[in-house]
């Protein structure tokens, strides 16, 4: 009986590992899934999913230019200025991204947020070969 229980436990562990690998693969292919994987507090709404579809098309170079118009406090900065750069660097560590803002302070804060995402355990699980070099953040 003991060997059957061990067999079932190993089977369950294997299934859980397979499930985790599938979740990770989805997060590598979709900015929406990336957001949900790396931030368990992120609340995805329909307008976030729609924006993510456009951002995915942008990262696949199906869209060359993308302008985002949404009311304040609807998640533009979180998706476009924080999550998207981290996602792009994970998929292409040699990418060049220029982040601009109306204030240097805001741009620096968003840059630190991107660094925090990229230094996170879950990010490194998705993109183990993507690392930041240089000054660490607190």
Name each model-derived stretch:
Residues 100-138:
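Conserved nucleotide-state-sensing and coupling region of NTP-binding domains
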Residues 87-96, 119-123:
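Post-Walker A helix-loop "phosphate-sensing" segment adjacent to the P-loop in P-loop NTPases
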